[in-house]
């Protein structure tokens, strides 16, 4: 699963997800892409599940690019712990995804195959997504 090798700080504020993605919202590498329509945190496990779904469907053909990286640590407190005594320990990593963000790109396969592979990947994600092609209009 994806996670940073090292970070400057162990813990981060939760932050807010306002507005559209103004970076990472154009197709850069492939011909087909999966674009987020809603804002959400996407965990490293969800990214890996989506990647597996796509690679298993396209088998040996084509290439996949993952355009999001989980670089935000999410902390959790142990179960049945009283409040106070500081922030919990980092449990997992998430990528902050805003509407318009390209999450996955694909190349080297026919459009129907790419569309089905992206549909399978989208089922693993907790947000609404949109299949787009290189010459298509974005959100």
UniProtKB/Swiss-Prot annotation:
GO CC annotation: what is one?
cytosolic large ribosomal subunit
Q: Name one GO molecular function term.
A: tRNA binding
Looking at the record's lineage, which domain of life comes first?
A: Bacteria
Q: Which Gene3D superfamilies match?
A: Ribosomal protein L10e/L16
Q: Which Pfam families match?
A: Ribosomal_L16
One GO biological process from the UniProt record? translation
- UniProt KW keywords: Ribonucleoprotein, Ribosomal protein, RNA-binding, rRNA-binding, tRNA-binding
HAMAP family listed in its UniProt record: Ribosomal_uL16
Looking up NCBIfam families in the UniProt record yields:
rplP_bact
Similarity field? Belongs to the universal ribosomal protein uL16 family.
Oligomer status and interactors: Part of the 50S ribosomal subunit.
In UniProt terms, what function does this protein have? Binds 23S rRNA and is also seen to make contacts with the A and possibly P site tRNAs.
**Which named protein is this?**
Large ribosomal subunit protein uL16
The organism that produces this protein has a lineage beginning with: Bacteria, Bacillati, Cyanobacteriota, Cyanophyceae, Oscillatoriophycideae
The encoding gene: rplP
């Amino acid at each position: 699963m994806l996670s940073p090798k090292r970070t400057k700080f162990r813990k981060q504020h939760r932050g807010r997800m306002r507005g559209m993605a103004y970076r990472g919202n154009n197709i850069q590498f492939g011909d087909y892409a999966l674009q987020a329509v809603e804002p959400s945190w996407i965990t490293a496990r969800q990214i890996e599940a989506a990647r597996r779904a796509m690679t298993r469907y396209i088998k040996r053909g084509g290439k996949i690019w993952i355009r999001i990286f989980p670089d935000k640590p999410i902390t959790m407190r142990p179960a049945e712990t009283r409040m106070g005594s500081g922030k919990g320990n980092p449990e997992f990593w998430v990528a902050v995804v805003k509407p318009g963000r390209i999450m996955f790109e694909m190349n080297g396969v026919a459009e129907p195959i790419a569309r089905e592979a992206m549909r399978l990947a989208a089922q693993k994600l907790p947000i609404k997504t949109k299949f787009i092609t290189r010459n298509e209009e974005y959100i």
